[in-house]
Curated annotation (Swiss-Prot):
Residues that hold substrate according to the record: S51, G52, A53, C127, G128, R160, E190, N212, M213, T214, R243, R272
Cofactor(s) the protein requires to work: Mg(2+)
Cross-referenced PANTHER family: CARBOXYVINYL-CARBOXYPHOSPHONATE PHOSPHORYLMUTASE, CHLOROPLASTIC, PHOSPHOENOLPYRUVATE CARBOXYLASE
Gene3D superfamilies for this protein: Phosphoenolpyruvate-binding domains
EC number annotated for this UniProt entry: 4.1.3.30
Binding site for Mg(2+): D90, D92
Pathway named in the protein's UniProt entry: Organic acid metabolism; propanoate degradation
Top-level taxon of origin: Archaea
Keyword Metal-binding: yes
Originating species: Aeropyrum pernix (strain ATCC 700893 / DSM 11879 / JCM 9820 / NBRC 100138 / K1)
Name by which UniProt lists this protein: 2-methylisocitrate lyase
Length: 308
């Protein structure tokens, strides 16, 4: 059904909390626009991840915290008004200090976020799998978490620590344990380097855990089943759809450049029928016809009353 005629998801934070409690593990693919979000929902995914890296990438910018809170809230609302599954939103460092994080949480929850992720890097932040990251103090991150928890209505607060690549595994565990005490609902250990590290982290941090299965990074390729067995409740694939879209576009553009036609790669394209079905195109036509019919009936009654 066309999203304009669907009721929005009510209290998405509670929906996500219940989903985490009911499922062994929740798989949340990364999305960066409403069409991809709608496709992911159509395919059966029960939660989505709005990736900061994918958003900035779609704007041809690096993942350095360059977008604004207003832009992120806009992207969030575009996606949450289309789908009826909870969306986890990557808010990078929270757009400032603790008092700024309060507004960030309120704005993103108002935009429909089910969970809001904040990390412990300094600004400008970096992709979690690059060298040269720097961290704020544990105390400053605790302040942000306390502020976030105090500002939210239902949204879950995801605390990401990038300490593994800066201070080492033990410090990552220590920070995570502190963040749980501060009230974080979910802990996200970024850039762990082996399945055994993920297992050890889960043994020592008593909270729902989120694993990042990105590509071309420091984390080896680990399956959803392996993460489940290691004790993780959520696994995200944050930039996979964005990377796939770029590669597919490159293939199509090269075909047009070299052959001057796309006819030999039609099997690689989403058809008109498939796209119309995805967005509920015919629902719009039906609605337009219904409005026209009602208008005609009203005008007919009006004309009859005048002539009668």
């Amino acid at each position: 059904m066309a999203f304009l005629y669907r009721e929005p998801l009510e209290r998405p934070g509670l929906v996500l909390r219940e989903l985490i409690e009911k499922r062994d593990i929740v798989v949340a693919p990364g999305v960066y626009n409403p069409a991809v979000a709608l496709l992911a929902e159509r395919m059966g995914f029960e939660a989505l991840y709005l990736s900061g890296a994918a958003i900035t990438g779609s704007l041809a910018m690096p993942d350095l915290g360059l977008i604004t809170l207003s832009e992120l809230a806009m992207f969030t609302s575009y996606i949450t008004r289309v789908v009826r599954v909870p969306v986890i939103v990557d808010a990078d460092t929270g757009f400032g200090e603790a008092i700024n994080v309060e507004r960030t949480v309120r704005e993103l929850e108002r935009a429909g976020a089910a969970a809001i992720q904040i990390e412990d890097q300094v600004m400008p932040k970096k992709c979690g799998h690059l060298q040269g990251k720097a961290l704020i103090s544990p105390e400053d991150m605790v302040k942000k978490i306390i502020a976030a928890v105090g500002a939210r209505r239902d949204a879950l607060i995801v605390a990401r620590t990038d300490a593994r690549g800066v201070e080492g595994f033990e410090k990552a565990v220590e920070r995570a344990q502190l963040y749980v005490e501060a009230g974080a609902d979910i802990i996200f250990p970024e850039a762990l380097t082996s399945l055994e590290e993920f297992r050890e982290f889960a043994r020592r941090v008593k909270a729902p855990l989120l694993a990042n299965m990105t590509e071309f990074g420091k984390t080896p390729y680990i399956t959803v089943d392996q993460f489940r067995e290691a004790g993780y409740k959520i696994v995200i694939f944050p930039v996979t759809t964005f990377r796939a879209s770029l590669k597919a576009s490159e293939t199509v553009l090269r075909e047009i450049m070299e052959k001057g036609t796309q006819k030999d790669i039609l099997d690689k394209l989403y058809t008109r029928t498939e796209f119309y079905d995805l967005i509920g195109y015919h629902d719009y036509e039906k609605r337009d016809a219904e409005v026209s019919r009602k208008a005609e009936e009203l005008l007919a009654r009006h004309n009859n009353s005048r002539t009668g």
